[in-house]
């Protein structure tokens, strides 16, 4: 991953634009019947928890809810498969704060596996943080997106 200013085409050092979590959120935001990863599989062993998360994202969903967005600027979308929700948020090169309202969830407690841009993601696009927490339909999550950043979660009923 690379920030906007550091991105370049180099054959022996492939990179993608945007933060690590921006790339992870794409698996939820963009509906695609065939998901794939670029590069050598051994490259993904460095951050196994990211690969494990991506592997759990289905290629088809039962329900889709557009939570927020503005064309060419940002998007937040929730998709359900069975009893599991996947939420993805992505921004363009403008950093932003957003609130993700979880009122689409049914009653009860859920476990949210969350990946967010790290504190240094605006300078080091691979920086991310992972959090696991209990959430309910009453929660509103405050999210900070780095330039070219993202946020994603897998939410399962407890």
Language-model region placement:
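Edge strands and adjacent loops of beta-rich recognition modules
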Residues: 51-77
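Solvent-exposed beta-hairpin/edge-strand motifs
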Residues: 104-118
């Amino acid at each position: 991953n690379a920030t906007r200013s550091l991105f370049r085409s180099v054959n022996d050092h492939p990179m993608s634009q945007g933060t690590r979590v921006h790339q992870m959120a794409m698996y939820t935001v963009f509906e695609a019947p065939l998901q794939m990863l670029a590069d050598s599989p051994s490259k993904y062993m460095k951050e196994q928890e990211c690969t494990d998360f991506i592997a759990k994202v289905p290629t088809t969903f039962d329900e889709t809810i557009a939570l927020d967005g503005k064309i060419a600027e940002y998007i937040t979308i929730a998709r359900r498969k069975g009893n599991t929700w996947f939420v993805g948020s992505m921004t363009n090169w403008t950093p932003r704060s957003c609130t993700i309202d979880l009122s689409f969830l049914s009653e009860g407690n859920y476990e949210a596996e969350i990946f967010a841009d790290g504190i240094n993601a605006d300078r080091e696009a691979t920086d991310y943080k992972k959090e696991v927490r209990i959430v309910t339909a009453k929660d509103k999550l405050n999210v900070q997106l780095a330039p070219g950043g993202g946020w994603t979660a897998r939410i399962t009923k407890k």
